[in-house]
Each structure stands twice: as C-alpha cells, then as structure tokens.
Amino acid sequence: MKYRHSFHAGNFADVHKHIALLALLRALKKKGKGFLYLETHAGRGSYDLSGHPAEAAGGVGRFLEAQHEAPELREYAAVIAALRARTARRHLYPGSPLVAAAELRAQDRAVLIELQGAEAHALEQSLSTLADARAGGLPVRVERGDGFLRLKAFLPPPERRGLTFVDPPYEETQQDFRQVTAALVEATRRFPTGVLAAWYPIKDERTIGPWQSECLRALRAALASPPAVLASELWLYPRDSRVALNGSGLLIVNPPWLTLERMQVWLPELQASLTTSADAGSSTRMLSESDR
C-alpha cells in the first residue's frame, strides 16, 4: 500500500489524525513551559483542494459541512478556517506541519523532517506564507533526511517536553510497520516522558492486532517502566477488505491526561459526521498487558 500525503490530502484519515494532533498539542500548551514538536515525515505542509478530489470531498469536505458538538471538532474546523484566512487560500488544506506551526507559542519550537527535496522545498514555502502573517516569524526548522534515521538526533529535547509525530507513507507496508515499531522504541528509550503519536493504515485487520502486540513487547523489552499506549482507530469500510484504505489508526505513547476520555467522545461524533454506513466504526482504548 502507498499512502502519499499529496494523493490523499483531506481524506478521512487526515481528518482523524489532525484532530488528534491538535488535541495533543493543546494538551501540551496547558503548561507554560515550552516543548518540541518533532515530525518525521512532514510532507509539503499544505495542499490545494480546488480540484475537489473525491477523497477530500468525503473527508474534510463532509466534515466542514457538519455541525459539531465536541470542542475538539469545532476547534479543528476553526483552525482550518483561520489558516485559510491567514494565507488567503480558500481551498487550502493544512497538513500536520501547518496545523502544528500555527499552534506554537514563542517558547515552543518544531523540527520537521522530510526526505524528498521537492516536498521539503514546498514545505518551506508553505511555512514562509504562514510566517509572514506572524510577528517574529515561526520557531520552525525544516530538516532534509530520512525521518526514521534522523529522529534520534533531536531526542531528548532540552525542554524535556515534547510531541513526536511519526507518519510515514507506507510505500513498503510491512517495512514501514517494522520501522515505526523501531521508532517508537528508540524515541521512548531516549525520551521516556515524551508524547509520541504514530499513524498507521488499516487495510487488513488481521495484521493490526499482532503489530500492536509486537509494539508493546518491544517497549517492554527496551524499558524498565513501559509507558502507557493508547490505540485510536476509525474505519469507514469493512476492516477485512483488501481493496483500499479501510481505516485510520493512531498509537499514542504517554497520552496526556484525559486523552482517552475525550477521544471516546469526539471520535464517534467524527465517524457520524463522515458516514452513516453500518460497516463504519471507531475505537479508542488503552493497550493492556493482556494485549501482549
């Protein structure tokens, strides 16, 4: 499976991951001390949806048409509207780097890693547009390289607070799953108190449970005190279909206080805003000892 950010921009998986990302960032901002936001596979930062691609129409398009009760959903819609206004691009869809950059305070900073040169250049352009509208610019650094390999260079951060976001393209699905597992272990070993979120595609349900169990085993083997791990999943199609992307998953290591409880509120509401299909569903739970 290949999940390239530009091809799938604005689809249901993006909406899921970006709402969760925004909620995690705002949880970190509840304390005054600064933090590092580190992203391993940043992409180009923003996408033009003026052609109304089908995936975006069924994702962020449908989301923005709905009325929302959960604050997390309303806040995400407001972030999109604000970024479109600040950049004067009415069809802009902000990727995770722009969502994060717009949230940073003066005491926070971000390191965004991107392997592809053209994508990294486009990311710098996206950020410069945003920086022009902010006094003092953005505390953001773009690094060109392999995010899996470069991750360890930035952890632990001197701030001792941070969020690492791992979102590879899954061009080589099984290899990327293995690399995500290794990244989870490496990042948590270097920065045991840091928050880490890793996105994964749900295509063949039979592979997800064993992979989650392997992540837990690897964390337990590497760390004297294994961290709490939350799994959040949203699917719009039968989980065992092998035709296309069926669902979106996030593993969150060291989830901030109330992340589980709040996600159990807003994720079902998000699902209902995107589809009424009986095949759809959502789940948010802590991975437990029995899952190992």
Model segments located where?
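Class I S-adenosyl-L-methionine-dependent methyltransferase catalytic core
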Residues: M1-R292
